[in-house]
Amino acid sequence: MVVSLSFPEADPALSSPGAQQLHQDEAQVVVELTANDKPSLSWECPQGPGCGLQNTGNSCYLNAALQCLTHTPPLADYMLSQEYSQTCCSPEGCKMCAMEAHVTQSLLHSHSGDVMKPSQILTSAFHKHQQEDAHEFLMFTLETMHESCLQVHRQSEPTSEDSSPIHDIFGGLWRSQIKCLHCQGTSDTYDRFLDVPLDISSAQSVNQALWDTEKSEELRGENAYYCGRCRQKMPASKTLHIHSAPKVLLLVLKRFSAFMGNKLDRKVSYPEFLDLKPYLSQPTGGPLPYALYAVLVHEGATCHSGHYFSYVKARHGAWYKMDDTKVTSCDVTSVLNENAYVLFYVQQTDLKQVSIDMPEGRVHEVLDPEYQLKKSRRKKHKKKSPCTEDAGEPCKNREKRATKETSLGEGKVLQEKNHKKAGQKHENTKLVPQEQNHQKLGQKHRINEILPQEQNHQKAGQSLRNTEGELDLPADAIVIHLLRSTENWGRDAPDKENQPWHNADRLLTSQDPVNTGQLCRQEGRRRSKKGKNKNKQGQRLLLVC
């Protein structure tokens, strides 16, 4: 059974004439109902940016945050699947249903250049027609969406864990480790997070700020750690690492003070591609690459004044500046030169299947520090190739020219000529299949016992190196030995260590009793009432803010 979904058009009265050239194709959404009545998504991905958003009065902060969420690839995929609204029991006033409608209308009807008005369900509980902190609104929205998902899960499965699509996309785990400096005993505590706050007071780059987050902190004097093994307060060290990496990484540059709201307006560089592996508590396997897809920017002196806007990366790879109703194209250089407030990165574990592709050839070049070190050493000890001293043309061009000038027919004639000179005759007697294949390739067989390695080389046709001296080749011919295609290498056993969509509960099964914290904002007042925490066996509840 195939059901086509259609959605109402955006308000034409809010159309932006100048934005119509930025949008082209309207996506087509088709939900296929499987045998067990679970919808599987099959849709043509929207390529352009979403609609502009109307400023209803000091609402630029929420417009900028909503644009970043709308262009979050995993979240957009989930919203466009309409999976949540099909199971929601109370869609009226539901934040998840409201976000689903917002993302769907913005992305599926962006071809006409319409300007949307954000839903009051998303804004009314927070927006009071005055400037607010965009990061605070962002975390408030994610929290309320998470709570909406939990209500649906608890109604259908009362014993279900406190997980949701919001946790699956944005959620990660901190590991806080305290080590007693006397007995060397350690105590680990794990806390959930939706964003990573970075202290930029002394950092020149995001990478440096991430390293500063993991610096060891000494606990002495009044802050000494009570060691269960020593049975008294002892000096200790405390370190904080990311234990479980999220699918979408939100890096919040702490530009505003907690009390006065004054802004730290300094330049902090950030990369287009980020490797999170060095900052993990257990950095195993290959690189863990992330790609930048959105940047939230603030212009002004305090968080309660000035102006907010954002940059987003569309599915086809182009960048756009989303400034309320204005949607303008830009380049990545402009994006990387901004004084960013919140950075949005999406995990790129599977480079060929993600929404925003990172160039495969640049993975090691951009992300792996060890590769950079080896590369610099090779440059120092690399000898000058005699091929480059040829006054004719570079060796790569000569190889291409030689390859192009030798056709398949000429190669067959040359092969037959070489066979005759080598004195090889084809017999009509019954041959072993392996010998038939070897003769077709023009290879000689040794009568004595052949090693397994040599058998493999002959099967691959690599014994040509032994017959180069017998071939009658032109004087200017170049023999190129090509390996078999490596296109399918690694497909049978892909890297499973850096898979996205980490399950926090699965990571904690082999650990000691764990402290799970509530979802909190970096700073600012709480706008919503959290559900009652269940004191599960072996856990103590910890409020992490």
Curated annotation (Swiss-Prot):
Impact after mutating residue 298 to Q: Abolishes deubiquitinating activity
What causes induction of this gene? Answer: Rapidly up-regulated in response to the cytokine IL2.
Protein localization = Nucleus; Endoplasmic reticulum
Listed A to Z, the keywords are: Endoplasmic reticulum, Hydrolase, Nucleus, Protease, Thiol protease, Ubl conjugation pathway
Catalytic positions are: 60, 307
Relate the outcome reported for changing residue 60 to S. Abolishes deubiquitinating activity
This chain belongs to the protein called Ubiquitin carboxyl-terminal hydrolase 17-like protein C
Please name the source species.
Answer: Mus musculus
